[in-house]
Amino acid sequence: MHNIFKGLITALITPFKDNKLDLYALERIVKHQIKHEVDAILIAGSTGESSSLSFEEYKLLLQTSVEIVNKCIPIISGCSSNNTTYARALAAESTKIGVDGFMASPPSYVKPTQHGIYKHFEALHEACNLPIMLYSAPTRSGVDFSDETILRLSKLPRILALKDCGVDLERPLRIRATVKKDFNILTGNDEVVLAFNAQGGVGWTSVASNIVPNICKELLEKWNKNDTKGALEIHQKLLPLYTALFVESNPIPIKYAAHYLGLCENEIRPPLTEASDSAKKQIENIITSLSIKI
């Protein structure tokens, strides 16, 4: 099975207007990613406010994205839930709609054991025939995969990757030494992409690439061509942007940044709130200093 989980994957925001999906803005956002040749887009993940979507909205979001993309780039759907039955329904619907793969985190809040985490993903694996990326986000889930559980899950034929949002930079080295050769490990943290890939990572699921996909793509291309100096120069230039985009809970800052650049409304669903005035100013200043334009 072809592994789509590699390179630059944009964790896409979900645009809203008047408390409904803004499909016109979605088209602008998706076409911006296609224009700059990202390797894939992730729909309805944490950055996409997936927990605020109804099942009908989830379906409409995926269906519209598939139509816009028209097979130009792979689409990965988020299928995280602390209800295994509901997560299976998301995975089954993703398959039906025609996305190219899906990502899921360990069930949040309920604090399953490692065996429970394994059984959850085994159930998702059985629910469809799509490739799967594990999503390690312990600050969101409250639990995480152990290295042993990742190894067990990697033996299931369609579990092909791990998106790691943790802070343990030894982890990709440890995992790389035990899992199958075609199992990919990507970081979900913009600020550590170079360090992570130096330790065995093969890509990057990025928040910043919602607004600077061209620069993120250039960074990764330089890294893959062994132009470490060039990649580091770009990374250092982007560091203030990474900081600004996480000055408040993701996706609050990136939603405002996208709005400031004309991609969408600055509408975010409760219990999240829009960016504070100080956060807005910080975001505006870095966008101006980097001359970011859409």
Swiss-Prot record:
UniProt subcellular location: Cytoplasm
GO cellular component: cytoplasm
Superkingdom of the organism of origin: Bacteria
Keywords, in A-Z order: Amino-acid biosynthesis, Cytoplasm, Diaminopimelate biosynthesis, Lyase, Lysine biosynthesis, Schiff base
Reactions catalysed according to its record: L-aspartate 4-semialdehyde + pyruvate = (2S,4S)-4-hydroxy-2,3,4,5-tetrahydrodipicolinate + H2O + H(+)
Coiled-coil segments on the chain, per record: none
Recorded family membership: Belongs to the DapA family.
HAMAP family, per the entry: DapA
Quaternary context: Homotetramer; dimer of dimers.
Record protein name field: 4-hydroxy-tetrahydrodipicolinate synthase
